[in-house]
Each structure stands twice: as C-alpha cells, then as structure tokens.
Amino acid sequence: IGPYYDDGDVDALTPADRLGRFLIENFVPHGYGVAQVSVFGTGESNHCMDLMGLDEQRGIHAAVEYLGSAPFSNGGVGIIGKSYDGSTPWEAAAMGSEYLKTIIPMSGLIGAHDLMWRNGSMEARGAIMHNGVYGSFGLDGDLEDAENACEGYLEGYYAGPAAYLSGD
C-alpha cells in the first residue's frame, strides 16, 4: 500500500514494477494473492493525499477490511513494503483489524513527525519530499487534480521558514 502504483489500469494483467513482480513470482505460487493499493491522492485513487494522517490510515484500514472479507479471500491479509510502503504496514497495524495477520515494514517510518519537524520548525526535506514529491503523485493534468490537491500543502512550504524567522 503506497503512492507508487500509478499504472492507472485496474484491469492490468502485469504488476507495477515496484514490489509487485517480486511478490507475484515468489508468493502467488505458494497460494497467496497480491493486491497493489494506492494511498489517497495517488495512482487512480482520489481524495487529498493525507501523508500518514488519519484519512490515509482509514483508507488503508478499508483496504485491509475489503481484502480480508472478500469472497476470494481466506481472511488473512499481510502487508509488505519498503520506504513509504514500509510505513503503511504500521498504519494498518495501528488501526487494528481481525484480518491483518502480519506486516513486513522495511525502511519505513512509524510516524512522520520526526522526519518533518525539528526544533519546532518544518525541515526543508519534509516540505520538498513529502508535500512536493508525494503531493505531486496525484496530479496528472486531468480534471480530477483539484480533488487531489490539499489546501494545506502550500502552507507547508512557508510555515517552517516563517516560524524560524519570526520565532513563533
């Protein structure tokens, strides 16, 4: 579960290259299913991207509940990922679900606060990487972009430096 699945074709017969091919080649032969799920505001999802926020957690929880209760499912869901995708398993575990049986988070964050803020001010890498890079994943030049643009993103670029300069 992450922001990297931008193939945009729900009927695709091949996986996104990120972890999908590895998972399909190594897990499917042993009876596991693989689903690649985009967080809000990325891929073909809509909504404002809520970087590791409550809305993102609710979306991840909804995906776990759906996959665990689907007719094709045996009721067991596991989540694996690295980098951003390595953070989403923790979000799923924090929400709690009878269907979530295991998580394999690799090189992810337990929370974004320490990455985004230092000494009461937003770090430049926080605004650039997360608001800029991840925030742009939901923007692809179509009419739905307005739904994916978060009103607080622009604030993130000036709030940290302004607080630092003003002492607030």
State the predicted function of each range.
Residues 10, 46, 89, 114-115:
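Short glycine-/acidic-enriched loop or helix-start segments at secondary-structure transitions
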Residues 59-68, 75, 108, 129-136:
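Short, basic, helix/turn surface patches
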Residues 71-84:
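Alpha/beta-hydrolase fold nucleophile elbow
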